[in-house]
Amino acid sequence: MIEPILLGIVLGMVVVTLAGLFVAAYRQYQRSNKIGL
């Protein structure tokens, strides 16, 4: 069985990682948009 605490830590890290990648990609997209215009 997977310990609830370990599962919570893993899920939390995954969510934070995905959120960080999304924010980084969004900022880069905005930057390229401004440069393109």
UniProtKB/Swiss-Prot annotation:
What is the stated purpose of this protein? Component of the cytochrome b6-f complex, which mediates electron transfer between photosystem II (PSII) and photosystem I (PSI), cyclic electron flow around PSI, and state transitions. PetG is required for either the stability or assembly of the cytochrome b6-f complex.
Q: Does the keyword Nucleotidyltransferase apply?
A: no
Q: Which UniProt keywords apply?
A: Electron transport, Membrane, Photosynthesis, Thylakoid, Transmembrane, Transmembrane helix, Transport
Q: Which residues form the signal peptide?
A: none
Gene Ontology BP, a term = cytochrome complex assembly
- Give TM segment ranges: 5-25
**Please, which domain of life does this record's source organism belong to?**
Bacteria
What topology does the record note for this protein and the membrane?
Answer: Single-pass membrane protein
Keyword Phosphoprotein annotated: no
Predominant subcellular localization, coarse grouping: membrane
Write out the GO MF terms: electron transporter, transferring electrons within cytochrome b6/f complex of photosystem II activity
Assembly notes:
The 4 large subunits of the cytochrome b6-f complex are cytochrome b6, subunit IV (17 kDa polypeptide, PetD), cytochrome f and the Rieske protein, while the 4 small subunits are PetG, PetL, PetM and PetN. The complex functions as a dimer.
Gene name per UniProt: petG
One GO cellular component term noted in the UniProt record for this chain:
cytochrome b6f complex
One family from Pfam that matches here is: PetG
Tell me where in or outside the cell this protein is found: Cellular thylakoid membrane
Q: Which family does it belong to?
A: Belongs to the PetG family.
Q: What is this protein called?
A: Cytochrome b6-f complex subunit 5
